[in-house]
Structures are given as structure tokens and as C-alpha cells.
Design a protein with these regions (language model features):
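Short helix-capping/hinge motifs at transmembrane helix termini and TM-loop junctions
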Residues: 30-32, 66, 98, 125
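Membrane-interfacial alpha-helical segments at the cytosolic side of multi-pass membrane proteins
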Residues: 53-68, 114-125
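Internal alpha-helical transmembrane segments of multi-pass membrane proteins
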Residues: 68-81
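Short, intrinsically disordered terminal tails adjacent to the first/last structured region
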Residues: 1, 135-139
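"…centered on the first transmembrane helix and the immediately adjacent amphipathic helix/loop
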Residues: 1-63, 79
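Interfacial helix-loop-helix junctions of multi-pass membrane proteins
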Residues: 35-43, 87-115
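Residue-level signature of the transmembrane alpha-helical core
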Residues: 19, 51, 55, 80-88, ...
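Membrane-interface capping segments at transmembrane-helix boundaries
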Residues: 123-135
Length: 139
């Protein structure tokens, strides 16, 4: 029985925050009126938007994977590969949604945001693990 349908295993619910972020990214990627276009005062506002969106997506995926008790390897694979693949897919799809266009530098910004998000999560995960190990060794 698939994971999402197993009555005894409801781990997929842990990924609802990631799904909501994914819906937001999809919406922002396909709308005609791009909010970042009006932010002409900020250099590379569009790229910053991509980095922040995918940083949040990677953090959510990693955090959701942790709550779902995924293995560390699977957690990092999902948190890295899913945003990278989805970011590339969205850039390709934008070609078919004028006035949007496919810009591979946007995908690079997605990848940078993903890398920063995963790195931040790794620092948090290492810190939390060391804190847990210290408290268990003191008992």
C-alpha cells in the first residue's frame, strides 16, 4: 500500500508545509504580473526572490523530512534534488507562459537558495544532535 494511503503510517502529513511552499512557488512562477518587476530599485530583485523562495523550500523539505523521521541520507537527497529538479522544470514551463520566459540564471539562483537552505539546516541539525548527545551523556 502506498505511503500516502497507509492508515497506520501518516508521515506524509509532515510534508504539508513543503507542499504549501511548492504551491506558492508555482503560483509566483506562472502569474503574468511579476511582483519583482516593480522592485526596480533593488539590483537583481528577481534573483533574490528566487534564492529566498528556494531557500525556504529546501528548509521546509528538510524540516518536514526530519519530522517524518526520514533517514538522514534520504532527507538531504529530497531537500537538494527536489528543489533543483522543480526549479529547472518551472524555468522550462515558463517558456510556454508569456510574458514569462525561461532564464537559466533564475535556475542558478534557485540552486544557490537551495544550497544555502540545506547548509542552514545542516548546521541546525548538527547543533541539535550535539546538544542532544551532551544532555544524554550528562545523565
Amino acid at each position: 500500500m502506498p505511503l500516502c494511503c497507509a492508515s497506520s503510517n501518516k508521515r506524509w502529513w509532515h510534508f504539508v508545509p513543503s507542499l504549501l511552499v511548492l504551491i506558492g512557488i508555482t503560483y509566483m512562477s506562472l502569474i503574468k504580473d511579476v511582483p519583482f518587476a516593480v522592485m526596480g530599485d533593488i539590483p537583481l530583485a528577481d534573483k533574490w526572490g528566487h534564492m529566498v523562495a528556494y531557500l525556504v523550500f529546501a528548509l521546509c523539505l528538510a524540516g518536514d523530512g526530519l519530522r517524518a523521521r526520514m533517514s538522514v541520507r534520504a532527507l538531504y537527497m529530497v531537500a537538494i534534488l527536489l528543489p533543483l529538479i522543480y526549479g529547472g522544470l518551472m524555468e522550462w514551463i515558463q517558456y510556454y507562459f508569456p510574458p514569462r520566459m525561461c532564464e537559466w540564471l533564475d535556475w542558478v539562483a534557485d540552486a544557490i537558495g537551495t544550497a544555502i537552505g540545506v547548509a542552514l539546516f545542516a548546521v541546525y541539525h548538527i547543533w541539535k544532535s550535539s546538544k542532544t548527545n551532551q544532555s544524554s551523556s550528562q545523565q
